[in-house]
Amino acid sequence: MAAARNATPTPQNGRDASRLSFAKITDTLTVPDLLALQTESFDWLVGSDAWKRRVEEGTAQGRTDLALNSGLEEIFEEISPIEDLGETMQLGFTNPYLEEQKYSIDECKERGKTYSAPLYVEAEFMNHLTGEIKTQTVFMGDFPLMTEKGTFIINGTERVVVSQLVRSPGVYFERQQEKTSDKDIYSARVIPSRGAWLEFEIDKRDQVGVRIDRKRKQSVTVFLKALGLTSEQILEEFKGVASIELTLEKDSILTKEEALKDIYRKLRPGEQVAAEAARALLDNFYFNPKRYDLAKVGRYKINRKLGIDKQLTDSVLTVEDILATIKYLVSLHANETKMNGTRDGKPVELRLDVDDIDHFGNRRIRAVGELIQNQVRTGLSRMERVVRERMTTQDIEAITPQTLINVRPVVAAIKEFFGTSQLSQFMDQNNPLAGLTHKRRLSALGPGGLSRERAGVEVRDVHPSHYGRMCPIETPEGPNIGLIGSLASFARINSFGFIETPYRRVVDGVVTDTIDYLTASEEDEFLVAQANAPLTKDFRFAEDRVLVRPKGGEVELVAKENVHYMDVSPRQMVSVATSLIPFLEHDDANRALMGANMQRQAVPLLRSESPLVGTGMEGYAAIDAGDVLTADASGVVQEVSAEVVTIQLDEGGTQTYYLRKFDRSNQGTSYNHRVLVSAGDRIEAGEVIADGPATENGELALGKNLLVAFMPWEGHNFEDAIILSQNLVKDDTLSSIHIEEYEVDARDTKLGKEEITRDLPNVSPELLADLDERGIIRIGAEVRPGDILVGKVTPKGETELSAEERLLRAIFNEKSREVRDTSLKVPHGEQGTIIGVKVFDSQDGDDELGSGVNQRVVVFIAQKRKITEGDKLAGRHGNKGVISKILPVEDMPFLADGTPVDVILNPLGIPGRMNFGQVLETHLGWIAKQGWEVEGKPKWAERLPDHARQAPAGTKVATPVFDGALEEEIAGLLDSTTVTRDGDRLIGSSGKTRLFDGRSGEPFPEPVSVGYMYILKLHHLVDDKIHARSTGPYSMITQQPLGGKAQFGGQRFGEMEVWALEAYGAAYALQELLTIKSDDILGRVKVYEAIVKGENIQEPGIPESFKVLIKEMQSLCLNVEVLSADGQAVSLRDTDDEVFRAAEELGINISTRFESSSIDDI
């Protein structure tokens, strides 16, 4: 990936070199590697070579905040040594390393395996009594590896581990108002990475109290005495502090022992107090590294907040920390604003302030590496217990590290995390942007995080400290709003897990190219100017007063000499998806949010087309998403086919690139590579070899540039509905390929083996026509619902046969009665072409099929879906709609030169939504499509870059967010577009033109806005939603049809619908709906029979739900009976009897998915 990032600018390398940009500001920093968040974190965990190189570079630059040990080394160091209770022996671990992986990525996907490598660690067992040392290399289980794209392959499916946003360990000070008086109550909390909390608070009587492990409040002076301070030392430390002196006066305890006992009594009421137990209790809470861990980040936060200089490796609390916390708290209480402390060995004045928990200085990221590390730590601590037990039970002479260690808990912990954790998610592979955004997602949910129900508005809200760190726009709509965010484009994560954003340093009013990465807390100390603050030629601020952001987020004007930093880029504050929206600055934030989210739902089309109006981010997004194939090294293309490209490298040797052809993505879209190079082409490192799904020439291409008119048309585009031209259907402009996967297993059953065969009972030869001799469908066959894909028979229980039947069996060797047909068939609503078949056989050594499975067949069906009524389309500005009508091209409105428009949108969708960016995009799209030439030096063109003064037709343009084309530039360019061959300019500076009605040929009375808009086809396709049921499965208890397409369910006829029919007096229609169309078991089978035989439908019977109601009333001890018209009690049969009777009497079972080919299924 790194090679791809610094590639030489050629039109084919996916960078914005081939786009004509309207940007006024040149970026001082290129967009960083967008997957670094994932890959760098995992590199640290396993200690890869790339991580070692980064550490060396950082150390050379004099950075001290780098982690010098890999994540795995850290946890094995933490757990070592494991000692037995008598401390006579110990087991230590050093030097964890990974061997070569067992299967390649492609093999893992093919076979449903996990892409992993065996983890080994050197274990050393030491016997203290004899001094004997035994060393062995021990296998610690298979460790899942990350692919280059930042994903994991678990059981053959691609998954992503989402980074988690959590509260950082450290010390926090809070101010709350006392309910009864106007007094402010101050409190402090010391929160560790793991271990017990420690809380201090000053109450309304000015008493200082402490809470240990969230239990009862106690006097702080008792706590200090328990830590070994005398009353004199406490007075010495807090000289002149009234609240502490007051607390000390009321405290009658004198010695450390008494204080410890007093604390023990309050923590463990009702237990016998021993001095030793009391001492151990406090030690274990805060001073034992096994039980309490601040982590480096917690120590760093405490050092900074309280002005202490402690080593970052000091991971437990010290008396000094506790005293400093109490001093800070009492100073806050006394309304002081400053306090003395030390930082880096120098005395500093600390600004006293309460903490804002939603500030990004107090929230940190747990990235992949740390999440997996925590999981391995859990597994190792479980293993530690096993090791201790084995040390006591095994013969001390025979013990080796191998006999002590059981790796099962470690393997189970890792497996559990990847398989079931809320943060390990099935990767969104709809298009390259969806995958990239998924990997850059930040979630506040998950273990150790927040829950949806408990999260208030404050946590979800946009905070000034998010600037340049988390995107204020891109977040889901719905219950997770604000809890799930996306990393900003230029942000990175430091070794403590805080998000840093880059700024250009300003020295004496001169903006330099020196770039500093600042965390949110560091940024609070500076004044930052925005990226588009005007500069002179020598990089000084052009104006005397500059708009800056001080702490707190309110902007203000300050003298230019006082500015410390300046933003590196106008798109610094937004995420990748948001920075792909042109004219974002003209859109309302709510609509921009929808636009950013809907780009992720765009389906890759048959032919990808990059936008005429982009933002310059398209290349970065496509290449970093990893779906585009780029050259690792420069050379000459030697050989090209649809599946393989071979390159003769400049440094000698060849390199072969394998392309993926029509693979199924996680979302069922087609994943296909298309070669861009030819044999003999010269290719540089980082240049694009092949396009992936939804990319064109290495640029993101999610939709199509279509000619759009904003006008009402016969009411068909009322309420966001969209009218399309038949041309788009005919030319496959918005067609996409979707691939579904179906699998069937042949297992061992109690009655014998299932068999995959062509020899199926009672199946006509026509249905078997496309099956090969094995009973598996041939590639290329067209299939429809109900067609057999894989023939399979299952043995059936033998029934006792009469003598005559046995004779017939003997004569005709009739075997068909022993098996039933359980073939894999095409489900309802699915159809397409067979594009692939995979067969796995346990006899071929495919041991991974699972127990009892002899054979597995996987069939892939591809279908081309043309655009149709009911499909959902959207622009990039949150302007979405459903297609209501596809008009013949001759009925579409057309321009003066006869060009029919492709899409008609409702103009009323714009003013209320305030996403005006779509109109500007439409105008600029027209300009780009036509080409332009600016004559002379008009005033509006003064700020245009020189290269943007003329362009040929079809030029792709970039208008970066917050730094794009201006309104007057667009109006001017509309007047400068290339004229048609008749010398006409169809659209002038108003952006409107005269349209003609395709049906009558008459012009419409008013001019209409027309231009090119980039339109996406979203994954909400009508083919996936449309659904019909005749008969199908029923619920076990109520015997009513199930609901939903997945269950092949029916339509719910609810309470309000019943009222509607009652209001109309439609009694018979209502009776049918409530009985034979729902849960009258016998009645519905009789109706089915009557329809088949063409007879009249009989009277309905008693619905099952009525019987359920009676049973419920009987369970409440109410004696309920049903009486017939003549007063006789009616006996109600059990459900099972009813179902059985219906099947027995009528020989029909209507609850199967497909009408069975054999009557024996009943």
Swiss-Prot record:
Name of protein: DNA-directed RNA polymerase subunit beta
The encoding gene: rpoB
Record-level GO BP terms: DNA-templated transcription
Reaction catalyzed: RNA(n) + a ribonucleoside 5'-triphosphate = RNA(n+1) + diphosphate
One protein family per Pfam: RNA_pol_Rpb2_6
Protein keywords: DNA-directed RNA polymerase, Nucleotidyltransferase, Transcription, Transferase
Role description: DNA-dependent RNA polymerase catalyzes the transcription of DNA into RNA using the four ribonucleoside triphosphates as substrates.
Assembly description: The RNAP catalytic core consists of 2 alpha, 1 beta, 1 beta' and 1 omega subunit. When a sigma factor is associated with the core the holoenzyme is formed, which can initiate transcription.
SUPFAM superfamilies (UniProt xref): beta and beta-prime subunits of DNA dependent RNA-polymerase (SSF64484)
